[in-house]
């Protein structure tokens, strides 16, 4: 459907019977109203032409071919030239000048003999109908399927049912109570005093006051909240058996919480109906829309048989049972058998349920091969449904798809793009650059160069890709982080490389997941990708505000291993006179570079303890505990200088106690980790300074 601004959109919701009639009924040029499907037949199997008023009727849904009507007779009759109309056949009622593609969107309708409850709003969880009526789904199931009847309140007027002691709005068995009143006027009694099936549910929904439901539900919710607070405040010491009281208290709390949840749902549903101007009784169908025939096709085989969509079989069942109900209502003899008419209405309800959703019921309707029919819900839901397969899953130009693999060496805003995909996606940009740089004289020569895949092609392609972001998307795109922008990097593999930290936003892992690649073409799309969609700009979850790019378990284990230190500590230097091994002395280094060079030359290990000269101030307040940390050992030298050795650092002091130098206890792994942190902070500080300078210039 289209809104006032002519923007194409799709909205799923409830509509009134009048709106269904406006969509599916129309007036022919001769003044006849068409749109109602009255017969279950589809094609005449002798001529393979659509049957009049059937599921493929050309009067209702439009012609199969332009200019050819259903009667296939000459258009011009010599004796009827005055009444001749080239756009309409007066004999069969088919409009000839209409495009046959109209059979893809022109609808019909079935006028149901009895109202039918919509299964989506009754059997799905939560049940809209059950919650609004403040009943359980099990309580409503018998009235919906005509197993019990509901007595109607008729004010103070005497009724036959009231003489038997029945109270208004009470469920009673159809066969037991109605058998007393069988007569030729039974139809009048039924219409006045009892109701069952969708008609009874529709009357109850029509009598609801939505604003009153909201007010009363809120008052009851507050009362239950007060009761729960009282239960929590009661001391258990007042009761002799605490265990039994605790069980009773927990059961009572669970019951109250379930009631609170139901009240919240009732208020929310009532607000939805009020906000959208939708009536609750529209959840009960009086008119059943019939899909356009091209959306439920029927094909003729070469052998002479016909294959058809499952929807046609389900529609035929609905029409057949609906016609049976109409036939029973027209004959007065039907009222002599009390169970006959309700059973027929129950069959109509079950047929419509199978048409709308064949998977909710206890026993799905099956074909002759014991295969469940595909209902309307099956055609639109899931990965192969109409929305995800045909509407959202269309093929797009300048796009590709491949499996994702981990790329830990990439930056957060980079992704590895296979050469085969990159040269196809950026071929237009590549041809333009080759011609502009005069590497190729024309378009044809540029294509030959690209086909040869020479080194110059890859160099030009790298330069193009550095300036052009790409979009990565993983279906299903449930939130805005499902599609993000990256700077592509050429790789020789055939899979897309992705940084592991961005997988949380995509809800992806590396067990065979695939991602789609898109190239933004317009300048607006490229600006949006750079300013809003880059992965390093989307580090916070849009729903709850928590960080979404957090270190994974592999990273944490790697950091733990790289910063691990051997357990000996400074006691590694202690002298053992009885030991046959030589005394081990931890090496000392003047700078980061000296320690890293020693590690590269394999003189020390990654976790070997070492002393590193530290030119900065040591914050002893962090190291000292409440009792103030004392030196573990003090070593004196012959010239009067001495070392104060602590657990993680040592200080060399002069004769009068002045500090000469400081060394900290660390490892090569910790040095590398500290350097990475310093470079990251320095880069962030430089980025902030540049941003401030840019703002100052502006």
UniProtKB/Swiss-Prot annotation:
Binding site for Mg(2+): 509, 511, 513
UniProt binding sites for Zn(2+): 69, 71, 89, 92
Gene3D superfamilies: 1.10.40.90, 2.40.40.20, RNA polymerase II, clamp domain (4.10.860.120), RNA polymerase Rpb1, domain 3 (1.10.274.100)
Source taxon at top rank: Eukaryota
Matching InterPro entries: DNA-dir_RpoC_beta_prime, RNA_pol_asu, RNA_pol_N, RNA_pol_Rpb1_1, RNA_pol_Rpb1_3, RNA_pol_Rpb1_3_sf, RNA_pol_Rpb1_clamp_domain, RNApol_RpoC1
Subcellular location: Plastid, Chloroplast
Catalytic activity entry: RNA(n) + a ribonucleoside 5'-triphosphate = RNA(n+1) + diphosphate
Pfam families (UniProt xref): RNA_pol_Rpb1_1, RNA_pol_Rpb1_2, RNA_pol_Rpb1_3
Any one GO molecular-function label of the UniProt entry: magnesium ion binding
Entry GO terms, CC: chloroplast; DNA-directed RNA polymerase complex; mitochondrion
Cofactor note: Binds 1 Mg(2+) ion per subunit.
Cofactor or coenzyme needed: Mg(2+); Zn(2+)
Subunit structure: In plastids the minimal PEP RNA polymerase catalytic core is composed of four subunits: alpha, beta, beta', and beta''. When a (nuclear-encoded) sigma factor is associated with the core the holoenzyme is formed, which can initiate transcription.
Job of this protein: DNA-dependent RNA polymerase catalyzes the transcription of DNA into RNA using the four ribonucleoside triphosphates as substrates.
Matches recorded under HAMAP family: RNApol_bact_RpoC1
Family membership: Belongs to the RNA polymerase beta' chain family. RpoC1 subfamily.
The protein's name in its UniProt record: DNA-directed RNA polymerase subunit beta'
Protein's organism: Cryptomeria japonica
């Amino acid at each position: 459907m289209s809104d006032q601004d002519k923007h194409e959109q799709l909205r799923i919701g409830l509509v009134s019977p009048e709106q269904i009639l406006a969509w599916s009924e129309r007036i022919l040029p001769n003044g006849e109203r068409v749109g109602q499907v009255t017969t279950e037949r589809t094609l005449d199997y002798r001529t393979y032409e659509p049957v009049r008023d059937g599921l493929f009727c050309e009067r209702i849904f439009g012609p199969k071919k332009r200019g050819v009507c259903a009667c296939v007779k000459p258009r011009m009759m010599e004796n009827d030239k005055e009444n001749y109309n080239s756009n309409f056949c007066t004999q069969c009622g088919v409009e000839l000048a209409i495009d046959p593609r109209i059979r893809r969107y022109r609808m019909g309708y079935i006028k149901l003999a009895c109202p039918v409850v919509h299964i989506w709003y009754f059997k799905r969880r939560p049940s809209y109908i059950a919650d609004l009526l403040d009943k359980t789904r099990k309580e409503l199931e018998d009235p919906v399927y005509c197993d019990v009847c509901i007595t109607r309140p008729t004010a103070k007027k005497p009724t036959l049912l009231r003489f038997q002691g029945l109270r208004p709005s009470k469920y009673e068995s159809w066969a037991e109570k109605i058998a007393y009143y069988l007569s030729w006027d039974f139809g009048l009694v039924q219409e006045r005093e009892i109701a069952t099936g969708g008609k009874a549910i529709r009357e109850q929904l029509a009598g609801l006051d939505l604003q009153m439901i909201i007010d009363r539900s809120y008052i009851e919710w507050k009362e239950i909240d007060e009761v729960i607070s009282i239960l929590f405040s009661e001391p258990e010491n007042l009761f002799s058996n605490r265990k039994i009281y605790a069980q009773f208290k927990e059961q009572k709390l669970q019951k109250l919480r379930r009631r609170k949840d139901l009240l919240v749902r009732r208020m929310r549903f009532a607000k939805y109906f009020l906000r959208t101007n939708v009536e609750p009784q529209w959840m009960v169908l009086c008119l059943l829309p019939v899909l356009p025939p091209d959306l439920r096709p029927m094909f003729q085989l070469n052998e002479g048989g016909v294959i058809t969509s499952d929807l046609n079989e389900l529609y035929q069942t609905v029409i057949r049972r609906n016609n049976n109900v109409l036939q029973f209502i027209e004959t007065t003899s039907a009222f002599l058998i009390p169970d006959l008419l309700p059973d027929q209405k129950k069959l109509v309800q079950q047929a419509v349920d199978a048409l709308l959703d064949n998977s909710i019921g206890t026993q799905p309707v099956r074909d002759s091969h014991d295969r469940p029919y595909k209902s309307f819900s099956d055609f639109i839901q899931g990965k192969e449904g109409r929305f995800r397969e045909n509407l959202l899953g269309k093929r797009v130009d300048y796009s590709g798809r491949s499996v994702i693999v981990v790329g830990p060496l990439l930056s957060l805003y980079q992704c590895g793009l296979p050469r085969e995909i990159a040269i196809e996606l950026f071929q237009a940009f590549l041809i333009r650059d080759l011609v502009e740089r005069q590497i190729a004289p024309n378009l044809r020569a540029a294509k030959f160069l690209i086909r040869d895949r020479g080194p110059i092609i890859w160099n030009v392609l790298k330069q193009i890709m550095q300036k052009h972001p790409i979009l990565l998307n993983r279906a299903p795109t449930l939130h805005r982080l499902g599609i993000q922008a990256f700077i592509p990097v050429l790789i020789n593999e055939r899979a897309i490389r992705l940084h592991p930290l961005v997988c949380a936003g995509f809800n992806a892992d590396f067990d065979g997941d695939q991602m789609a690649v898109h190239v933004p073409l317009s300048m607006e799309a490229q600006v949006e990708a750079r300013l809003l969609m880059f992965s390093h700009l989307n580090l916070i979850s849009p729903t709850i505000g928590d960080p979404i790019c957090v270190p994974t378990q592999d990273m944490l284990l790697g950091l733990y291993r790289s910063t691990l230190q051997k357990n000996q500590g400074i006691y590694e230097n202690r002298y053992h006179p009885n030991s046959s091994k030589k005394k081990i002395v931890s090496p000392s280094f003047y700078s980061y570079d000296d320690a890293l060079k020693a590690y590269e030359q394999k003189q020390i290990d990654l976790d070997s303890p070492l002393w590193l000269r530290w030119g900065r101030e040591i914050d002893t307040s962090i190291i000292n505990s409440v009792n103030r940390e004392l030196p573990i050992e003090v070593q004196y030298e012959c010239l009067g200088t001495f070392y104060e050795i602590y657990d993680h650092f040592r200080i060399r002091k002069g004769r009068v106690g002045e500090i000469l130098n400081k060394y900290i206890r660390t490892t090569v792994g910790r040095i590398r980790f500290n350097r990475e942190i310093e470079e990251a902070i320095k880069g962030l500080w430089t980025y902030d300074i540049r941003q401030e300078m840019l703002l100052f210039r502006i």
